[in-house]
């Protein structure tokens, strides 16, 4: 088992630089320099990552551990930042970079709206927040943003925004403390899966209430900043595979339009 896991990781590690290496070999070959051009398909494709949809119990355990984050003299605001950061990512379905790069002026506490700037595809959007999160953001703003003395809503070191590495490192620690197993590099669960869980849990709630899913999909698309409705429809299939008891309802909405999660390219969304 250990050998197989190591092999899969090795394939994924090697697959990424193959394209530039192949182009370099072609460039050398055109200039008369003997070079072996690695044929397409020489390496197996990396295993497709299947998003981890956190259960309600896992989310509760994860957020409980963020609340227990301790003071650190090197990053004196960490214990205040982390509980709100990860709740904001989940409750608003944000990408990690969208959250960590929020500036203080991007958060309108009075209106309860986040201004997401230069997101995936270079797009901006406004994200309304729920009433409970708005209260939490207001308290956080009063106790943290004014004290940080910087431009960032979630400040890191030296008045700079949090790095993705810092976010991931803290997230892995909270997962371990919450007893949520992690499969190692490339196998998750990941921070981005909080965004997936947001979409799936909203769809699950809409199905339970008998809402018109076809009418609400464009709303979810806009809220999450998807460039295509197909990216949003992907979550219908993910919802069905995560909660088989509503798969018949999902199938009536999408039929066979959206491919199974275990096939096709990996969706970052």
Regions found by a protein language model. Name each.
Residues 33-68, 117-120, 156-160:
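Flexible interdomain linker/hinge and immediately adjacent N-terminus
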Residues 92, 97, 101-139, 143:
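Conserved tyrosine-mediated DNA breakage-rejoining catalytic core shared by Y-recombinases
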Residues 53, 118, 224-255:
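Catalytic-site neighborhood detector that most strongly recognizes the C-terminal catalytic loop/helix
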Residues 1-14:
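Single conserved hydrophobic/aromatic residue that forms the stacking wall/gate
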Residues 64-96, 120-123, 148:
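Basic, Lys/Arg- and aromatic-enriched nucleic-acid-binding interface segment
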Residues 250-269:
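C-terminal secondary-structure termini that scaffold catalytic or DNA-interacting sites
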Residues 71-75, 127, 169-222:
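Short, basic (Lys/Arg/His-rich) helix/loop patches that form interaction surfaces
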Residues 121-138, 151-173, 186-190:
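C-terminal catalytic core of Y-nucleophile DNA break-rejoin enzymes
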């Amino acid at each position: 088992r250990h050998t197989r896991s190591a092999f899969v990781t090795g394939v994924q590690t090697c697959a990424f630089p193959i394209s530039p290496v192949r182009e370099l070999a072609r460039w050398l070959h055109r200039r008369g320099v003997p070079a072996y051009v690695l044929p397409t398909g020489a390496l197996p494709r990396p295993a497709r990552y299947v998003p981890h949809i956190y259960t309600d119990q896992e989310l509760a355990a994860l957020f409980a551990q963020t609340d227990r984050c301790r003071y650190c003299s090197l990053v004196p605001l960490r214990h205040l930042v982390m509980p709100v950061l990860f709740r904001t990512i989940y409750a608003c379905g944000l990408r990690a970079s969208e959250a960590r790069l929020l500036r203080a002026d991007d958060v309108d506490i009075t209106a309860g709206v986040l201004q997401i700037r230069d997101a995936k595809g270079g797009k901006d959007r406004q994200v309304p927040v729920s009433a409970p999160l708005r209260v939490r953001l207001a308290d956080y703003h009063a106790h943290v943003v004014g004290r940080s003395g910087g431009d960032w809503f979630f400040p890191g070191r030296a008045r700079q925004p949090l790095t993705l590495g810092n976010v991931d490192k803290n997230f892995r620690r909270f997962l371990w403390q919450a007893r949520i197993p992690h499969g190692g590099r490339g196998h998750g669960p990941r921070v981005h899966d909080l965004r997936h869980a947001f979409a799936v849990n909203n769809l699950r709630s809409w199905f339970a209430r008998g809402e018109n899913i076809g009418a609400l999909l464009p709303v979810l698309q806009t809220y999450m900043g998807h460039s295509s409705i197909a990216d949003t429809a992907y979550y219908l299939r993910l919802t069905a595979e995560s909660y088989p008891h509503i798969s018949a309802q999902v199938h009536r909405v999408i039929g066979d339009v959206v491919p199974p999660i275990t096939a096709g390219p990996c969706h970052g969304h």
